[in-house]
Regions:
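Alpha-helical substrate-recognition element adjacent to the catalytic core
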Residues: 2-100
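Short amphipathic alpha-helical segments and helix-helix/interface helices
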Residues: 52-56, 110-111, 134
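Alpha-helix termini
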Residues: 55-59, 114-120
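Short alpha-helical
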Residues: 72-76, 105, 132
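Short, aromatic/basic amphipathic alpha-helical patches
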Residues: 78-85, 113, 135-141
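Short loop-to-alpha-helix "cap/lid" segments that border enzyme active sites
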Residues: 81, 101-116
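A short acidic, often aromatic-flanked loop/helix-cap motif at beta-alpha or helix-coil junctions
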Residues: 96-103, 132, 150-151
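Acidic, Mg2+-coordinating phosphoryl-transfer loop and its flanking beta/alpha structural elements
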Residues: 121-151
Length: 151
C-alpha cells in the first residue's frame, strides 16, 4: 500500500535550466521561447540541483516518487534524467499544445491521478519553486514546500 507520495517539480527545483528560460514583460515564462530552446543540446547543458538527491532518498525510504513538471517532455529530457540517476516512479508533464498556467495544469493532473484508489489515502507532498503552483496544490489538499526550505 502506498502511504507517502513525494512529488518534485523540475525547473528551479531539481534542475537548473535557467540558461534556456525567457520571460514575458509580466515576469511569467515565455512558453514559446521555452519550447524553442528545448533542443537536446541545450537540455544536456541543464544542471542538477541538490534537491534531486531527495528523490533518491525518499524512493529508498519507500515513498512513491514523482516528477510533475510543466515542461513538454522530450526524449532528451528523459535521457537527461536517466543519465543523472533520477528515476522516479512516475513522471507527469505538460501535454503538447497545452498552454494552461502551471498551477492550474499541475493541480488538474495530480487531482485526477490521486483520485485513483491506490493513491487516495496517501500523504502527498510537492516540492515546487513557483508560488502559484504551491497555492493551487494546497487548494486540492497537497502539502507543498519551497525548495529553499529543504536542508
Amino acid at each position: 500500500m502506498i502511504t507517502n507520495i513525494s512529488i518534485f517539480d523540475m525547473d528551479g527545483t531539481i534542475v537548473d535550466s535557467s540558461h534556456r528560460q525567457a520571460t514575458l514583460p509580466d515576469g511569467t515564462l515565455n512558453l514559446d521561447a521555452w519550447i524553442e530552446n528545448a533542443t537536446p543540446e541545450k537540455i544536456f547543458k541543464d544542471k542538477v540541483l541538490p534537491l534531486a538527491e531527495q528523490i533518491r532518498k525518499r524512493h529508498k525510504a519507500g515513498d512513491y516518487t514523482m516528477i510533475c513538471t510543466a515542461r513538454v517532455m522530450s526524449e532528451a529530457d528523459y535521457e537527461f534524467l536517466m543519465n543523472e540517476g533520477i528515476n522516479p516512479d512516475k513522471i507527469i508533464s505538460r501535454p503538447l499544445g497545452n498552454t494552461e498556467p502551471d498551477g492550474q495544469l499541475k493541480a488538474k493532473q495530480l487531482k485526477s491521478l490521486f483520485n485513483l484508489k491506490q493513491f487516495k489515502k496517501a500523504t502527498k507532498i510537492m516540492f515546487d519553486d513557483a508560488a502559484s503552483v504551491r497555492s493551487a496544490l494546497r487548494k486540492i489538499g497537497i502539502a507543498t514546500i519551497h525548495p529553499s526550505k529543504v536542508k
